[in-house]
Amino acid sequence: MKNVLLVIATVFALATPALAQTRWAVIVSGASGGEKYAEQMNTWRTDLRTVLLNRYQFKPEFVKMFVDEAATSGDKGSAENVRKFFAELKKSSSKDDFVFIILLGHGTFDGDVAKFNLVGPDMTAKDWTDMISGIQGRVALVNTTEASFPFLESLTSKGRVVITATDSAAQKYATVFPEYFIKAMKEASTDLDKNGRTSIYEIFAAASAAVKQHYEQRGQLTTERALLDDNGDGKGREASAEGPDGGIARIAYLDSEAVPANATPELAALIRRRQTLEQQAEEHKQLKGVMPDAEWNAQFEKLMLELAQVSAEIRKKSEK
């Protein structure tokens, strides 16, 4: 294992720009539920769009925003509009794309079916699962509403990052999670590993800690516990808990490192290969303890060796 540790250190030392891909951000603001919430959601939408454009350098044409019924301009957050957009996204997305979806507003659970409240007919967790199925590329969906846990159970898929504001469908009160999730997106301190980039996992962890502190400072029982799932088992875990989830979310960055303007097709292919290897390494970690140690170590070392070789080749070609 000494060789493996040496290789891992080498990989981090050889960090190089990642492949530029289309990064989509889809902000879905559903039915507001009243003037008080409408004002709050307008602030959240505005802050989200601003931080995505300014801090994370998303291109304006790839930031889609659906608004609540109180908004005077913009596409309404109706089931019809949302379905139409995602149908088009399925056609235009590619396997190298990253699609970040965040749901703002309110959710309900009637004891059987969980829904996200929209302007007009609501959409169930299954509706959302069916709608985003088939999107090419990496997908991260954050449901910030009350009663959101069933969305994690439904949307779970290996490699797909799903975050819900609650760990139970029974939590029926408006959540504070979106406030702290957006705040975490804006703060440099969220970059916990200090690598100059901010991952979905880091935002989730920072927001979760802030929610806990929110309730403690008010002397209240914590009624919402956010969960993250990215291994496809539909269970998820809290940021402060141990568990298999989080590997993919740790390398799902909101910001994108720039590819050199003179990048050749060969360099682009190498960068794609490195991203694939990084994901395979995270997935392989989930097999620790499941397969024989000797076999696990051999496969992991093989992945790390190739990752180091590819990273070295990328650095070499980037310096030309």
Predicted regions and their residues:
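Caspase-like cysteine protease fold
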Residues: 191-278
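Boundary/activation segment at the start of structured domains
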Residues: 4, 18-100, 107, 114-116, ...
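Second-shell loop/turn segments in exported
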Residues: 31-39, 68-76, 89, 113-119, ...
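Extracytoplasmic/secreted proteins, especially bacterial periplasmic and envelope-associated proteins
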Residues: 36-47, 51, 77, 81-88, ...
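Alpha-helical, heptad-rich or low-complexity scaffold/stalk segments
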Residues: 144, 263, 270-273, 278-318
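Bacterial N-terminal signal peptides
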Residues: 5-17
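Active-site microenvironments of hydrolase-like enzyme catalytic domains
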Residues: 86-120, 135-176
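Active-site-proximal C-terminal subdomain of hydrolase catalytic domains
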Residues: 46, 140-230
